Design a protein with these regions (language model features):
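N-terminal acidic, glycine/proline-rich low-complexity segments
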Residues: 1-117
């Protein structure tokens, strides 16, 4: 199964949730899952902290084969690399991508707004 994880990962940020990081670790280790990318969104923290924290997590885990993409800063900020990645990846793999969205849903709304098909 090809998966994109859309999340607000703050695993490693003091006094923050760890669920997103654990979700990624589970998906990445599962033999039937191919993680196509991680799209970062705000919620547990701002998009900057979430993005750079996710990059740090990937470095700590020595994972270099999964792209990490930064989402918009606020609701309605739909023109971001995360939105473009979601739209492009789904369009290039029709019917093959499962999006697991566990963050603010801003990237999902942006992808739908950009390309409702």
């Amino acid at each position: 199964m090809k998966v994109i994880l859309d999340c607000d990962n703050t695993m490693g940020v003091r006094k923050s949730d760890v669920d997103d990081g654990l979700t990624f670790a589970y998906l990445y280790a599962h033999p039937d899952v191919e993680v196509q990318g991680i799209t970062c969104t705000f919620a547990n923290n701002n998009e900057h902290v979430v993005y750079y924290n996710t990059l740090q997590m990937m470095e700590d885990l020595e994972i270099t084969d999964v792209p990490v993409l930064k989402g918009g800063r606020t609701p309605g900020a739909y023109d971001s690399e995360a939105v473009n990645f979601l739209v492009d990846t789904v369009n290039k793999n029709p019917g093959e991508i499962t999006v697991i969205a566990i963050g603010s849903m801003c990237n999902i709304a942006g992808a739908y707004t950009k390309d409702p098909e």
